């Protein structure tokens, strides 16, 4: 059993390969560098390129939401607050709100991509003891990265925490959309349903079930990504110019969160592509509250006619409560 750390084993393996294939340059391997020069700069490349995939995913989702919003601009439904009918809206307006949020997540990811695209070749404790800043600038330019303005032996982890927050907000947006679809798929509502294939089973015990399992899965994955953020923020604090307390955390949460968010974007796109919307049911549900959704309009008309606001509110509320009880 080896007693080498992963980092030591990797460097040893690379050294052996170079020694065998290019012995004349072997002595310059890792010359004047510290491991974090390689690892942190490589991590910046990984996160930058991964973010490009997430941006592409959100771009596709945003386009689909825009298309659906236009399709349902006249699909009237009950707007709900606290789960109770409030005033009429259209399903198109709801989707337009999702589209706007998708665009905000795109903007955040683009900023996060820029924020994380920093490298460092400043050596031990970031002191440039063996190389000058010009060498760091050359390496970063070749990699299309920006040199970290003032590094220690590592790139400061507030960058990674800021980057990660963009992932958290993206996941939370998908959860919000998926949660709404779950509510709309309730038997008592049944205004929209996620896709359900002909050979799919909703329950092992109850053959009639059509459970919103895709959207439930998305909500669960969002919780997982959010739970990682605490650890990422904890990584900001390290001892002096470097320790490795952040390393074990990042090896788990960074690749996991990026992969999960990419999966969530693809899964949500699948939900949108197969979303079954029932405008007739939306209209029926809207009408089920017997016109109570127009209570504010009635109250404002009474006020315009000269009645005091308090009296108008009381009159409409009294009538509304009677309608609630008697229909």
Feature names for model-found ranges:
Residues 1, 206-327:
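Glycine-rich cofactor/substrate-binding loops
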Residues 1-128, 132-138, 147, 200-203, ...:
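A helix-coil-helix interface module used to build multimeric assemblies
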Residues 9-13, 17, 64, 68, ...:
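Generic, well-ordered alpha-helical scaffold segments in large soluble proteins
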Residues 68, 72-75, 109-112, 116, ...:
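Hydrophobic stripe of amphipathic alpha-helices that form coiled-coil interfaces
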Residues 105, 109, 153-247, 251:
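Glycine-rich anion/phosphate-binding loop at the beta-strand->alpha-helix junction
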Residues 136-153, 157:
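Active-site-adjacent "gating/activation" loops or surface patches in catalytic cores
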């Amino acid at each position: 059993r080896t007693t080498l750390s992963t980092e030591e084993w990797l460097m040893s393996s690379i050294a052996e390969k170079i020694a065998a294939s290019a012995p004349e340059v072997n002595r310059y391997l890792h010359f004047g560098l510290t491991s974090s020069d390689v690892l942190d700069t490589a991590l910046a490349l990984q996160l930058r390129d991964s973010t490009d995939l997430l941006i592409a995913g959100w771009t596709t989702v945003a386009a689909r939401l825009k298309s659906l919003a236009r399709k349902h601009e006249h699909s009237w439904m009950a707007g709900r607050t606290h789960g109770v009918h409030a005033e009429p809206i259209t399903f198109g307006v709801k989707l337009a709100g999702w589209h706007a949020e998708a665009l905000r997540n795109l903007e955040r990811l683009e900023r996060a991509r820029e924020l994380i695209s920093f490298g460092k070749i400043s050596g031990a404790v970031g002191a440039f003891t063996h190389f000058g800043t010009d060498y760091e600038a050359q390496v970063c330019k070749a990699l299309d990265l920006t040199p970290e303005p003032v590094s220690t032996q590592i790139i400061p982890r507030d960058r990674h925490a800021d980057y990660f927050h963009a992932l958290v907000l993206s996941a939370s947006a998908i959860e919000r959309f998926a949660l709404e679809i779950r509510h709309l798929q309730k038997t008592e509502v049944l205004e929209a349903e996620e896709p359900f294939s002909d050979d799919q089973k909703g329950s092992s015990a109850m053959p009639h079930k059509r459970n919103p399992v895709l959207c439930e899965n998305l909500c669960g994955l969002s919780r997982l990504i959010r739970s990682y953020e605490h650890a990422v923020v904890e990584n900001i604090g390290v001892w002096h110019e470097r320790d490795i307390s952040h390393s074990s955390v990042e090896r788990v949460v960074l690749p996991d969160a990026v992969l999960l968010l990419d999966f969530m974007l693809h899964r949500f796109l699948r939900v949108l592509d197969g979303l079954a919307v029932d405008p007739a049911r939306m209209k029926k549900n809207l009408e089920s509250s017997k016109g109570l959704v127009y209570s504010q309009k009635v109250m404002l008309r009474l006020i315009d006619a000269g009645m005091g606001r308090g009296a108008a509110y009381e009159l409409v509320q009294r009538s509304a409560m009677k309608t609630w009880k008697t229909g």
